[in-house]
């Protein structure tokens, strides 16, 4: 079996979406009574499909996402045999401080075929040197993943998620709206809060307003701020929690290690915005901040 790996195109969106949707055993939605009910895929709205796993849950949102990738946001690859797509990989180049450095992060590796998986990984490894990346990384949730059984993985960082109270504090800071989405701004910056995959991938997902055409997403209160506190700059992304408007999901990019002053500024600003709880994912070595 000869497997070809190539850059994905818009024409591939249907097949890629099918790979992701095949992993969803039951399609559901919340009815007007607030109860979860099983529904056929075809009867769900684009947004209801989105809630099951993001952009690749439908061709419509997948095409929007693919267009963003092809314009330079990331690297989309497909593995095919005789023009039939068996696998998809999506990766992002990110330039961050140590221990990450300049890396190529795998955001998605979707295939049910081991040979296709290996072919996609080999194609990404071949891109490391031309892209001047020192390592290929992938995130896992919980304990060992299937990749631990197949490949030699070296842990770099462990992420912990915390609920932090938003509260007013005696801190002098400046917070202004910042809508510039040029990724060059965070080149070499750390992402001490909200880094689930890589700084670049999170930026392309959160800072770019590519999903405003979905009214349900547009209605969620979202803020992008440039914060200056005690001589340190930070870029803050804050989004209302899906089911609790008094909770917020937070992501922060900084040119230097995270400081107590920046955290205090974020908590104070969030409290003034009406939030009472901040959901923050941080490296376990930095949680004392």
Feature map (PLM): residue ranges:
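Extended, charged low-complexity segments
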Residues: 242-289
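Conserved active-site alpha-helix within GNAT-family acetyltransferase domains
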Residues: 142-158, 284-289
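Conserved acetyl-CoA-binding loop-helix of GNAT-fold acetyltransferases
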Residues: 111-128, 150, 256-271
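A short, internal acetyl-CoA/4′-phosphopantetheine-binding micro-motif in the GNAT/acyltransferase core
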Residues: 80, 92-97, 103-117, 247-260
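Amide-forming acyltransferase catalytic core, primarily the GNAT-like/NAT-type
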Residues: 14-20, 24-83, 151-244
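Extreme N-terminal starter segment of soluble prokaryotic enzymes
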Residues: 2-5
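Conserved GNAT acetyl-CoA-binding A-motif
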Residues: 128-141, 272-283
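Conserved GNAT-family N-acetyltransferase fold
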Residues: 77, 87-89, 104, 109, ...
């Amino acid at each position: 079996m000869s497997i070809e790996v190539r850059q994905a195109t818009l024409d591939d969106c249907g097949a890629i979406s099918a790979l992701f949707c095949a992993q969803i055993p039951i399609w559901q939605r919340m009815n007007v009574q607030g109860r979860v009910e099983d529904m056929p895929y075809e009867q769900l709205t684009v947004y209801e499909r989105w809630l099951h796993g993001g952009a690749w849950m439908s061709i419509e949102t997948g095409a929007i996402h693919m267009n963003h990738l092809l314009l330079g946001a990331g690297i989309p690859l497909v593995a095919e045999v005789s023009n039939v797509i068996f696998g998809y990989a999506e990766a992002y180049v990110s330039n961050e401080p140590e221990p990450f450095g300049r890396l190529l992060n795998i955001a998605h590796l979707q295939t049910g075929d081991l040979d296709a998986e290996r072919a996609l990984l080999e194609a990404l490894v071949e891109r490391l040197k031309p892209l001047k990346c020192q390592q290929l990384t992938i995130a896992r949730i919980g304990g060992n993943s299937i990749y631990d059984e197949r490949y030699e993985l070296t842990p770099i960082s462990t992420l912990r998620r915390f609920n932090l109270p938003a509260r007013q504090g005696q801190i002098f800071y400046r917070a202004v709206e910042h809508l510039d989405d040029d990724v060059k701004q965070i080149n070499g910056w750390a992402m001490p809060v909200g880094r689930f995959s890589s700084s670049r991938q999170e930026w392309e997902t959160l800072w770019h307003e590519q999903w405003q055409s979905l009214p349900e997403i547009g209605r969620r209160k979202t803020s992008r701020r440039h914060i200056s506190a005690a001589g340190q700059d930070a870029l803050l992304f804050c989004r209302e929690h899906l089911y609790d408007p008094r909770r917020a999901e937070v992501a922060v990019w900084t040119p230097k290690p995270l400081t107590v002053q920046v955290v205090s500024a974020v908590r104070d600003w969030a409290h003034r915005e009406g939030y009472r709880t901040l959901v923050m994912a941080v490296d376990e070595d930095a949680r004392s901040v």
